[in-house]
Amino acid sequence: MKTYVSNEYDVIVVGAGHAGCEAALASARMGEKTLLLTISLDMVAFMPCNPSVGGPAKGTVVREIDALGGEMGKNIDKTYIQMRMLNTGKGPAVRALRAQADKWDYHEEMKRTIENTPNLTLRQAVVDDLIVEDGECRGVVTNTGARYRAKSVVLTTGTAARGRIFIGELNYSSGPNNTIPAIKLSESLERLGFKLRRFKTGTPPRVNRHTIDYSKTEEEPGDKEPRHFSFTSRDEDYLTDQTSCWMTYTNPKTHEIINENLDRSPMFSGDIVGVGPRYCPSIETKVVRFADKDRHQIFLEPEGRKTEEIYVGDFSTSMPEEVQLEMLHTVAGLEKVEMMRPGYAIEYDVVDPWQLTHTLETKRIKHLYTAGQMNGTSGYEEAAGQGLIAGINAALSAEGKPAFTLGRDEAYIGVLIDDLVTKGTEEPYRLLTSRAEYRLLLRHDNADLRLTEKGHDLGLIDDDRYAEFLAKKELIQEDLDRLGEITVHPTIAVNEYLAGLGQTDLNGGVKADVFLRRPRVTVEDVERLTGQKLAGDRYVKEQVEIDIKYAGYIKKQEIQVARLRRQEAKKIPKDIDYDQIEGLATEAREKLAKIRPETLAQAERISGVNPADLAILSVYVQNGKYAKVQK
């Protein structure tokens, strides 16, 4: 096809899913002339699977995105239909906010934000090729022949990259939700020498809400207490008219139908070769893998206020359409349900993430960044977090400024990216709280304290919001100091209160911060018992209470972080030749040469690099032997 020269930009972002939207908005807000290209303008920030945002670890990522100046938290706070805090009976490190989204409102609101953002142009196009000159990415070529040039390019192709949908024996080339797949871009990446692999994900059927017998299901209402993802959202705007979700279960009859039709499932017939997600398996995989279980939970989740579609959560399947309906009709409450869309599996290309740096720039081609599901992750939140970092770094690169990264001790986003680039992934990667060594420091409640200053330095947090943040920090310190001054006396009221908690009496006066360390004692109780009011609002008080109650554990993790930072400060030269280092185990040598860690701390986290290998490497890097092993 004949090509033509179109416009020139500072940054081009390919794909307008959750990663692409954050990347493009970050770049434009940092002052870069940005082009956002998407296969379909009707799919901007679309939710092809679960109509929700947040959950364990993921919810904290959304708060981190917001603290850095990203959009996902604001967007869901404008478009949710239900909000719930999960794990409220557990410690603060694992509490998680989850919102049920109106997926159509979410898409429309994000598209409106993008269209109204200065420096940002949104266009519909399929990108077929990259413009690469002297090992640097300098633009893209679309299927209509347009050549757009740029200083940096961010790819966020999601599941559209050579996507193929499977429904029983039927399979066809497609992106998510029957959109156009991106075929030639994958071929372009392979020609450039990138290693691609196939992953698989899936989605459940959607059913008509009016054909469900809700009397046979369990209601899951939203929280009455105001909750928000964005630190800028106000309690007075909290939605009181929330939409419930509903829970039901599969049963032995459901499992019998699944087992009888496994030969028709592309997951088991061999038609699907892509690796599926461990933590979000299809219902047929769950039935086979957990054959001892008589039932599995199913969540019925509304997709929005203006649609009749209900998402059948935890029921992902690629069975033939008629088998899906037969399966649904065995479930309590769904005996007469009408299916509006069948579930399907989708295979797609991913870039092996060891080919990336911590900035999400590719090692092979300079000024080319990748983010989202094409890096091997699953989930909207993981994608958005990567997109934000890739967009920030694409903008910084366009300006010739130093790159921006987040450490494992600074954010779940840092954990996610570090896991990808130092360990790679053999399956769709899902962020879990257990992946974070310092999760007590990386909480839902303190994301602003960790990251707002960084967002302000990048130009993504405006001065007004930054001033509010500084005022909050001052109030936290003021209330911490105040609790160190207030005395709680052993009054009758105090000891009756303690008896009600099953605790021993107070024999003498103690400072309020010491009293607050007792289990189940709250800041509000201290205020009531002493008659002394603190200055902060409920969010400040929450922070104060956590800081005091968990001070010892937080201190331990801060000591561990100090050790990590010492190791991170020990840089490994880029041109080191691992073949010349004597004593390294073969596996360690191969892994180090493949991943090429930037610091000793990163090398330590690579699977296959043992302590002995690390000690040898450390000697070469730190003790003057490096010159002997230069390439």
UniProtKB/Swiss-Prot annotation:
Coiled coil: none annotated. InterPro entries: FAD/NAD-bd_sf, GIDA_C_N, MnmG, MnmG-rel, MnmG-rel_CS, MnmG_C, MnmG_C_subdom, MnmG_C_subdom_sf. The keyword NAD applies. Residues 214-233 are annotated as: Disordered. It holds the Pfam family SAM_GIDA_C. It is found in: Cytoplasm. Gene3D superfamilies: FAD/NAD(P)-binding domain (3.50.50.60), GidA associated domain, C-terminal subdomain (1.10.150.570), tRNA uridine 5-carboxymethylaminomethyl modification enzyme MnmG/GidA (1.10.10.1800). Keywords: Cytoplasm, FAD, Flavoprotein, NAD, tRNA processing. GO terms for biological process: tRNA methylation; tRNA wobble uridine modification. Its cofactor is FAD. NAD(+) binds at residues 276-290. It comes from the Bacteria. FAD binds at G15, A16, G17, H18, A19, G20. The keyword Flavoprotein applies. Its main location: cytoplasm. Signal peptide: none annotated. GO terms for molecular function: flavin adenine dinucleotide binding. GO terms for cellular component: cytosol. Belongs to the MnmG family. Homodimer. Heterotetramer of two MnmE and two MnmG subunits. NAD-binding protein involved in the addition of a carboxymethylaminomethyl (cmnm) group at the wobble position (U34) of certain tRNAs, forming tRNA-cmnm(5)s(2)U34. This is tRNA uridine 5-carboxymethylaminomethyl modification enzyme MnmG. It comes from Lactobacillus delbrueckii subsp. bulgaricus (strain ATCC BAA-365 / Lb-18). The gene is mnmG.
